[in-house]
Regions:
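Amphipathic repeat-derived elements
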Residues: 28-52, 163-192
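Well-ordered mid-protein domain cores that form the structural environment of catalytic cofactors
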Residues: 83-186
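N-terminal regions that are enriched for targeting/export leaders
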Residues: 2-64, 68-74, 80-81, 86-95
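Short coil/turn segments at the loop-to-beta-strand junctions that recur within blades
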Residues: 141-145, 191-196
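Internal, well-ordered alpha/beta segment that forms a basic, Gly-enriched binding/recognition surface
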Residues: 199-200
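Conserved small/polar residues in nucleotide/adenosyl-binding loops
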Residues: 203-205
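Short, charged/polar micro-motifs that form catalytic or ligand-binding hotspots
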Residues: 55, 115, 191
Length: 205
């Protein structure tokens, strides 16, 4: 499905990294080997897929979700869909949207409290249907006033979603906590002297 778009393009625009320009739904899938019948569910991945075929940086393409559904030893479907934020050309945006909706939504995808969310580092997440269709920007019923990191963590004991947001203007850093049922229950500004990029990693010791 991918194709090289420029002869001397950077690696993220060529070969296996090259963007695909078509949204597919395939229900006749060839399986090589054997899918365990107890392996049921949907696997989804998110990544940058610039709709123009050009991108100045690996992280700057529009978000595209790829997904496959497995059930009873079969692969029922594969599909890929753009995350339809106002950044996408055919989104119907008219320029009056809240700036926090201006997300590429191209970095990560999570499932929490019955919601499937496509994430990036600076804006609100985007909620998707189980079939990968875009539902819209998600802000916890208006309670999330900042953006949301692309790398939240789920507490293994409480099921709460822990995340933060950082920005170029105050508040520079805000910590958030959502309950296991998906309610935003805590937002705390963390006092820092200025804007800084914060990137969370999980380290096992």
């Amino acid at each position: 499905m991918s194709e090289a778009v420029q002869k001397d393009a950077p690696f993220w625009l060529t070969g296996n990294f090259a963007p695909t320009f078509t949204e597919h739904t395939e229900t006749t899938l060839k399986v090589t080997g054997h899918i365990p019948p107890e392996l049921n569910g949907r696997y989804m991945r998110n990544g940058a897929n610039p709709e123009t075929g050009e991108s100045v940086h690996w992280f700057a393409g529009n978000g595209m979700i790829h997904g496959i559904e497995l059930a009873n030893g079969k692969a029922n479907w594969y599909r890929n869909r753009y995350v339809r934020s106002p950044i996408l050309k055919d989104s119907g945006a008219d320029g009056t949207e809240d700036p926090r909706t201006q997300s590429l939504a191209n970095t990560h995808i999570i499932s929490h409290a019955g919601k499937i969310l496509a994430l990036e580092e600076s804006h609100w997440p985007y909620e998707l249907s189980p079939e990968l269709e875009t539902i819209g920007a998600y802000n916890y019923n208006g309670k999330l006033e900042t953006g949301m990191t692309a790398h939240p963590k789920v507490c293994p004991e409480t099921g709460e979603l822990l995340f933060f947001a950082y920005g170029m203007v105050p508040p520079y850093l805000t910590y958030h906590r959502a309950s296991a049922t998906g309610e935003l229950i805590q937002s705390e500004v963390i006092d820092v002297k200025g804007a800084t990029m914060v990137h969370l990693s999980l380290i096992h010791i």
